[in-house]
Every structure is written in structure tokens, then in C-alpha cells.
């Protein structure tokens, strides 16, 4: 991956959240784009990575949805006077990346106990599920951005997606009164430019550019009795003979050379 594509991929994380499709729509679109490559057993980079993220997102999404459903069902058995665990006592995504997966439950339990030692067991389970679901959602957000990048590179080409991300970020960072009303689209960027053809016929060959070299002055010539004479040369004095009469021969021309025959 060249430096421009690498920079564009990093900039994907800065795009607004509502720019990307919802998880269900994203996975469906990605599968449609990947299906021809799956049938041909392609091992292209974008195919392999996009396939990995499709599987990852589907598993994480189903698990996260299950966590939310169980957490909501526990609300009915939590004592009504129980205060929710503040956000500061819940493990965040950045912290979870530094904690081994097997120790995640222990770290979260210690934080709940530090908030309230006798916290009800049902409320503790609810707090754990909410914390893990939040971590999964942030991981899903990163994964869906990467999935969007890789399957769009298959659809439009990596260079076009790189160009599109650059233009879109420029549009987003430009004040509203100085930019166009609509954001750029990748369809418009990849559409071939059509030049309107006029009614004038053009030659198929290459046209010589004008104005680069001075024009050469054409030298007019006239034919005088079978000989070409340039008008740019110095003219001889006019002959007294009338036009069309033979030129008088010089005196030397009257002397004939001796003939080889006797």
C-alpha cells in the first residue's frame, strides 16, 4: 500500500459515524461485492481482509445484540433503589485493549465493588453486560470502517477510494459558506469525463501547435522562359524587348564552338 492509500485508510476513522451504512446494510453490501471473488477463490488482499471483517462483524454483532437483550431483561429484577454504576467505573475500550481477556471480568468486578461493596448481584451482571457491549460496539465501529474501505476498493479501485476520501475530508473541513451544497460522491469521481463535440470537423492527425515558431515567409517565384526566378533576388534592368519576344543573344553567343565533325 502506497503512502497516499495508507493515509486515506487512517483518515477513514475520522469520518462521521452517519457516513457509514448500518451494520446489517454494510454486511449485506459487502457480501454482494465479495460474492464473485468467493466463487473464483480469489486470494486478493482486499478479498481476504474484507472476508475476515465480515465474519468478525457478524459474530460480534450477534453477541453484542444478545448482551443488550439480556441486560434489558435484568432491569425487571434489579431493586428500584439501586443506582446505576457511573461511567467512570466501567472499563472503556482503550483500557480493555491493555487488559488480557481472561482478566477483564476481574478488573470490572473490582471497580463495581469500589463503587459500592454490597452492590446487588443482578445489578452487577447488568453493569458487566453494559460494559462489555459498549466495548464490542466500539470494536465493531472500527471493524465496519475497515470493511467499508476494503470492499469499496474491490468495487471502485484503491486509487479511486483514496482520491474520494481525500476530497471528502477536504469538503468536510471547508466552512459551509465556501463549499458546495452536496458532498462529493465516489460515483461522480469515477465517472468518465465526456467532452462535448462541436459541429466542426477535425482531422484525425495531430495538429501542429501555432504560435510556438515564427512563420517562414513564403518566397514567390515566377517562371521566365523555362527558368524559375525568385522575386526576392535583385531584378535585372528591364529589357527593351517587348513581352514574349526572345531575349537577344550576347555577342559571345554568336561565336559557335568548333564542331568535332569536319
Swiss-Prot record:
Q: Which domain of life is it from?
A: Viruses
- What biological-process GO terms show up in the record? microtubule-dependent intracellular transport of viral material towards nucleus; symbiont entry into host cell; viral penetration into host nucleus
Residues modified as Phosphoserine: 232, 239, 245
Keyword Transcription in the entry? The reply is: no
Q: Where is this motif: Bipartite nuclear localization signal?
A: 215-233
One Pfam family this sequence matches: Hepatitis_core
* Region ranges (Disordered): 183-262
Q: Which GO terms describe its cellular component?
A: host cell; host cell cytoplasm; T=4 icosahedral viral capsid
Function per UniProt: Self assembles to form an icosahedral capsid. Most capsid appear to be large particles with an icosahedral symmetry of T=4 and consist of 240 copies of capsid protein, though a fraction forms smaller T=3 particles consisting of 180 capsid proteins. Entering capsid are transported along microtubules to the nucleus. Phosphorylation of the capsid is thought to induce exposure of nuclear localization signal in the C-terminal portion of the capsid protein that allows binding to the nuclear pore complex via the importin (karyopherin-) alpha and beta.
Kindly provide the name given to this protein in its UniProt entry: Capsid protein
Q: Report which gene this protein is encoded by.
A: C
Amino acid at each position: 500500500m502506497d503512502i497516499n492509500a495508507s493515509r486515506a485508510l487512517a483518515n477513514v476513522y475520522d469520518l462521521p459515524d452517519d457516513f457509514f451504512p448500518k451494520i446489517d446494510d454494510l454486511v449485506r453490501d459487502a457480501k454482494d461485492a465479495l460474492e464473485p471473488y468467493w466463487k473464483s477463490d480469489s486470494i486478493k488482499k482486499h478479498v481476504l481482509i474484507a472476508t475476515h471483517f465480515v465474519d468478525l462483524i457478524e459474530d460480534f454483532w450477534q453477541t453484542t445484540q444478545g448482551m443488550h437483550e439480556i441486560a434489558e431483561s435484568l432491569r425487571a429484577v434489579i431493586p428500584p433503589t439501586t443506582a446505576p454504576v457511573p461511567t467512570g467505573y466501567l472499563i472503556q475500550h482503550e483500557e480493555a485493549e491493555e487488559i488480557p481477556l481472561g482478566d477483564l471480568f476481574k478488573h470490572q468486578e473490582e471497580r463495581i465493588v469500589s463503587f459500592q461493596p454490597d452492590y446487588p448481584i443482578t445489578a452487577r451482571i447488568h453493569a458487566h453486560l453494559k460494559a462489555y457491549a459498549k466495548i464490542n460496539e466500539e470494536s465493531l465501529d472500527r471493524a465496519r470502517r475497515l470493511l467499508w474501505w476494503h470492499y469499496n476498493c474491490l468495487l471502485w479501485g484503491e486509487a479511486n477510494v483514496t482520491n474520494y476520501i481525500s476530497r471528502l475530508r477536504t469538503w468536510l473541513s471547508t466552512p459551509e459558506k465556501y463549499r458546495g451544497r452536496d458532498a462529493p460522491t465516489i460515483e461522480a469521481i469515477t465517472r468518465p469525463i465526456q467532452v462535448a463535440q462541436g459541429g466542426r470537423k477535425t482531422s484525425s492527425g495531430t495538429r501542429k501547435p501555432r504560435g510556438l515558431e515564427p512563420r517562414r515567409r513564403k518566397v514567390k517565384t515566377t517562371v521566365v522562359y523555362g527558368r524559375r526566378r525568385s522575386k526576392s533576388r535583385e531584378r535585372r534592368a528591364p529589357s527593351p524587348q517587348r513581352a514574349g519576344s526572345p531575349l537577344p543573344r550576347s555577342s559571345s553567343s554568336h561565336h559557335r564552338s568548333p564542331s568535332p565533325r569536319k
